[in-house]
Regions:
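An N-terminal-biased, well-structured beta-alpha scaffold segment characteristic
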Residues: 1-78, 211, 223, 234-236, ...
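Phosphate-binding beta-alpha-beta segment of Rossmann-like dinucleotide-binding domains, i.e.
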Residues: 79-137, 171, 301-303
Length: 387
């Protein structure tokens, strides 16, 4: 039996994927697995029972990923599950920035008591006029699941699309339209594009990457969109760029006192993945990954440990080891098992940076004593008897 805990509301469609072997607990330190969306976990102390955390979404900056790794806690996310929902909002953001649709709606609402509203509308509509996005140049920084979908949709809307991503995956590249132009530098995006949208994770290297230096390289009257992470844009520099006319509009999904209600800025209340479909997709993907990990020891879409898939165990026993990626670990594991008279029938070992993960299928059941001896090896974070 396994227990799970939800730090945020999780779509029922996902929770219904859990079999009768799973029960929900209100105590996080009784849980084998934790499901989370936006709740901040950095100040939480997690007990030894917690084996995995699944973020129903892509970003994991609300989770202490490195600290979890050292506790042997695998952190999962759900890349691509909410991509279409975010993509649609980005496209909507470009349209809202191109024509004063919001201003027009507000103006009409203010005239609701006037009999001649139709005639007034004809006289006043020119103040809300704008431009079409067809034929304009769109620069996309980051061509992951969301960025690639934005790129393809924008081409269908008649935009000339430039993409920059030095780390693009082969799968993402294959999914891109052939009409998308490959930019070799951010400077090319800045200097060429009428619209720029950001789709990168928040890292030390990307924090405030859109700063004064970047704005200085952009075309006058550029439209900037940020539906990725709030700290990617230096908002003090942004305000100056808006006041100078360098930036025409800034559209963001991240509200704060500096940007809310300011002229030239459109702010939505973190609606990117707030669609029924996105929430369902994220929840289903998160639950499937947790179940496969807890029941089989397999890892898919982890942000700290490597992907590792040994399928379903057909032998007498299976154990998994979360450990440091350092020399001589495997030889120490096999010695402990050999000394206990345990024969290894299959082994899968994968590494990711400083971390590694090993799945061992064995011909005889594993005792708690053997697991204890494996855990005592320097560099081992967690040993789990899966079967």
């Amino acid at each position: 039996m396994f227990q799970y805990h939800c730090l945020n509301p999780i779509a029922e469609r996902g929770l219904n994927m859990f079999s009768e072997d799973y029960t929900k607990t209100e105590n996080i330190n009784e849980a084998d697995a934790v499901l989370v969306r936006s709740a901040r976990m950095h100040d939480m102390e997690l007990g030894d029972s917690v084996k995995a955390i699944a973020r129903a979404g892509a970003g994991v900056n609300n989770i202490p990923v490195d600290a979890c790794a050292e506790q042997g806690i695998v952190v999962f996310n759900t890349p691509g599950a909410n991509a279409n929902g975010v993509k649609e909002l980005v496209i909507a953001g470009m349209l809202l920035a191109s024509r004063d649709i919001v201003g027009g709606i507000e103006w009409v609402a203010g005239q609701k008591d006037k009999e001649n509203i139709d005639k007034l509308a004809e006289k006043q509509k020119k103040q809300f006029a704008g431009c079409e996005i067809s034929g304009k140049k769109l620069g996309i920084i980051g061509l992951g699941a969301i960025g690639a979908m934005v790129a393809n949709s924008a081409t269908h809307l008649g935009m000339e699309v430039y993409g920059y991503d030095p780390y693009i995956s082969i799968d993402a590249a294959w999914n891109l339209s052939r009409t998308i132009k490959h930019s070799k530098s951010l400077d090319e995006i800045y200097s060429q594009c009428d619209y720029i949208t950001i789709h990168v994770p928040l890292l030390d290297s990307t924090r405030k990457m859109i700063n004064k230096e970047a704005f200085d390289k952009m075309k006058d009257g550029v439209v900037l969109l940020n539906f990725a992470r709030d700290l990617l844009v230096d908002e003090e520099a942004l305000i100056n760029a808006l006041e100078s006319g360098k930036v025409k509009k800034y559209v963001t999904d991240f509200a704060n006192p500096l940007v809310a209600g300011r002229e030239g800025i459109l702010v939505t209340p973190h609606l990117g993945a707030s669609t029924e479909e996105s929430e369902d997709n994220c929840a289903v993907m998160a639950v499937k990954q947790l179940m496969d990990y807890l029941e089989n020891g397999n890892i898919k879409n982890s942000v700290n440990y490597p992907n590792c898939d040994a399928g379903t165990c057909v032998d007498e026993g299976r154990l998994t080891i979360n450990h440091k990626n350092i020399p001589n670990m495997i030889s120490q594991f096999t010695k402990v098992l050999g000394d206990a008279g345990v024969n290894i029938s299959n082994m899968t070992n994968k590494s990711k940076g400083d971390l590694a993960y090993t799945i061992l299928d064995v011909a005889t059941p594993i005792s708690q004593e053997v697991a204890k001896n494996l855990k005592a090896i320097n560099g081992v974070y967690r040993v789990r008897i899966v079967k």
